[in-house]
Amino acid sequence: MTTKPIHVIGGGLAGSEAAWQAAEAGVPVILHEMRPVRGTDAHKTDGLAELVCSNSFRSDDAQTNAVGLLHAEMRLAGSLIMRAGDANQVPAGGALAVDRDGFSDAVTQAIHGHPLITVVREEVAGLPPSEWDQTIIATGPLTAPSLAEAIRQETGAEALAFFDAIAPIVHFDTIDMDTCWFQSRYDKAGPGGTGKDYINCPMNKEQYQAFVQALLDGEKTAFKEWEGTPYFDGCLPIEVMAERGPETLRHGPMKPMGLTNAHKPDEKAYAVVQLRQDNALGTLYNMVGFQTKLKYAEQVRIFRMIPGLENAEFARLGGLHRNTYINSPALLDITLQLKSRPGLRFAGQITGCEGYVESAAMGLMAGRFAAAARLGRKMMPPPATTAFGSLISHITGGHILSEDEPGKRSFQPMNVNFGLFPPVELPKPEGKRLRGKEKTLAKKRAITARALADCSDWLGVPTRAAAE
């Protein structure tokens, strides 16, 4: 066992997971978190692993969904983030959603309670000193300007950025349940769910058209120097989606499919707004897909146009912050280490992965890589056939050449998805040729079965541990 610590900068999901993994490997860790000494535009507390956007970890289906597969692999690897998420889940259909305060508290208590982890509340204003040696930067999308500038100078490259928006949260007791009803889409029950995990607010055609026009006309926050920054398609502001066409929203977050109005079962809604439980008590619900850059007064006015939310009181209104990430394919090796400075690793959203779970997964990997290096052990990266490996491959090199700039690789933030995995040979049922949805489902099952088997072999643990 070594006495020289690994330093982790940033106490978000990636940093907390990295610290946990390294400490569990027997290596001392110093975790540096700048809050509350220095706050950010999006964080509200000084807790570790605070969720500043959605409270959803998305699908928990490990057989036919890529992020559900990543959940399973992280459980196999002893993830603190997944342990805390499972312990603080709230009903959310087929998704794993968590009570954000309970989740953060669980991670904070676990980190502070680990005998090999020391938490230091301070801002690291520049790149770490060389004597720190093994260091992980996991400062996320809200990296302090001084550190961001130091990273830019070290890498010789401009940081890339995109907007990330936050959805409003509504007090449950101000929602009109004589208009709204509980139902998951297609009555699908997820972990801890009942098939009635979302609140649904129906709109007829006239109400929908008036709502879309209000979104288009509503006063937005101006961003000046950020205005030219591209959005990430997975987290578009609701008004930006409305700008893409009058029918865009009812084919996106407001789609009515798979839902039946409990009060008027014979009346088909033209569009539906869904709200998802945000805390364990069930007193708060967030508006699914309603991240926004509308000004606060406009949010209240426009969102109260939604049937059932006419008297809604908001626990939190929507907002917008900027995500910053590095050009990882050019800068990082396959162990997430900076090519120009061995021993310095990056993890989480700053690497260009998108999503809570993906960020935590890369923290998990960085923590294990750093611990192995500190202990003088050679650690092979996870197979590319696993969700872990597919994300690392994406971050460190799985990109096409840019047609606009020959010789430069195209690199954009990415959620885990089946398109990142190597092809798999489908099973061939005797006397039957798979087609359409059946073929797609079989392909997903084949990819996930291969991934879990390969991940189990790589970790040296039985596959069944993923469900524990």
Curated annotation (Swiss-Prot):
Source organism superkingdom: Bacteria
Coiled-coil intervals, chain numbering: none
A GO-annotated cellular component: cytosol
Binding sites annotated in the UniProt record for FAD: G10, G11, G12, L13, A14, G15
Alphabetical GO biological process terms: tRNA methylation; tRNA wobble uridine modification
Recorded catalytic activity of this chain's protein: uridine(54) in tRNA + (6R)-5,10-methylene-5,6,7,8-tetrahydrofolate + NADH + H(+) = 5-methyluridine(54) in tRNA + (6S)-5,6,7,8-tetrahydrofolate + NAD(+); uridine(54) in tRNA + (6R)-5,10-methylene-5,6,7,8-tetrahydrofolate + NADPH + H(+) = 5-methyluridine(54) in tRNA + (6S)-5,6,7,8-tetrahydrofolate + NADP(+)
Transmembrane segment boundaries: none
Top-level EC class: transferase
Cystines in this chain: none
SUPFAM superfamilies for this protein: FAD/NAD(P)-binding domain
Listed PROSITE patterns: GIDA_2
One Gene Ontology MF term: flavin adenine dinucleotide binding
Cofactor: FAD
EC numbers: 2.1.1.74
Role summary: Catalyzes the folate-dependent formation of 5-methyl-uridine at position 54 (M-5-U54) in all tRNAs.
Alphabetical list of NCBIfam families matching this protein: gid_trmFO, PRK05335.1
Name this protein carries in UniProt: Methylenetetrahydrofolate--tRNA-(uracil-5-)-methyltransferase TrmFO
Native source species: Chelativorans sp. (strain BNC1)
Protein encoded by which gene: trmFO
